[in-house]
Design a protein with these regions (language model features):
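Glycine-rich phosphate/diphosphate-binding loops that line cofactor/substrate pockets in enzymes
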Residues: 80-86, 131-135
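Short, flexible coil/linker segments at domain boundaries that flank nucleotide/cofactor-interacting
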Residues: 85-88, 167
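Glycine-rich active-site/cofactor-binding loop and its immediate structural neighborhood
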Residues: 87-120
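Cofactor-cradling patches in redox/metallo enzymes
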Residues: 109-112, 119-189, 202
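Short acidic-hydrophobic, aromatic-tinged amphipathic segments that line or gate anion-handling sites
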Residues: 190-195
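A charged, well-structured terminal subsegment
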Residues: 202-214
Length: 214
């Protein structure tokens, strides 16, 4: 049985890394029909996407490769989607600019890791984050800034959460190419992530802290 499972997962991996969308989709459906667990399928897609992301960061893949891998990852998560209770809720968005790639990568990785993710999209402003926190009551707010001119928006968002009496009810995770750990501490954020895998680890750490009352 384990050998059959491994063969199904290998077929998914081979087609994923060859960017064969329809073949990967068919292999995924066969795996699920054969009894491979949805959790295991989702985990494989997560690992494959992280491998593609690493190749992109090493210069081995182009942005076109990464975009194709993202589409494959999204397809796999959709097919493997199970009705389970999310371990936490995250609101995510890009403050002030139209940059989306990094934010979308983290959104998919969070979903694969068991989080419910509310995506506010791009060109989001602090008021929209605050309104979403009031409406959705998330555990974590993940706000990205990709250009220096938008850095004040992260500070403003944290300040507005404080003024609304929401700051102690949610953990704030910030990131983006122009941010730093020092900046996160300066504005009063709870966590900072430089890269996507780090963002997932930070989200899990912050969720644990929230549940422990830290």
């Amino acid at each position: 049985m384990r050998q059959d499972t491994d063969q199904h997962l290998q077929a998914i991996g081979e087609n994923f890394l060859a960017f064969k969308y329809f073949e990967a989709e068919a292999a995924t459906k066969r795996a699920l029909a054969a009894g491979v667990s949805r959790e295991e399928v989702a985990k494989v897609f997560q690992g494959l996407f992280l491998e593609a992301l690493a190749r992109y960061e090493d210069g081995k893949y182009s942005i076109a490769h990464l975009t194709a891998a993202q589409s494959l990852f999204e397809m796999g998560l959709d097919l493997a989607k199970a009705k389970v209770t999310p371990k936490g809720k995250v609101i995510i968005g890009t403050l002030g600019s139209s940059h989306y790639l990094g934010k979308d990568i983290i959104r998919l990785l969070l979903a694969a890791d068991g989080f419910e993710v509310i995506d506010l999209g791009e060109i989001v402003f602090p008021e929209q984050f605050v309104e979403a926190v009031e409406r959705e009551k998330p555990d974590i707010v993940a706000a990205a800034v990709m250009i220096i001119a938008c850095l004040p928006l992260q500070r403003a968002m944290v300040g507005m959460l404080q003024l609304k009496g929401l700051r102690d009810k949610v953990k704030v995770l910030v990131g983006g190419g122009v941010t730093s750990e020092r900046w996160a501490a300066e504005i009063g954020a709870d966590g900072w992530a430089e890269r996507a895998p780090q963002a997932i680890a930070e989200a899990n750490r912050l969720l644990r802290e929230l549940k422990e009352g830290v």
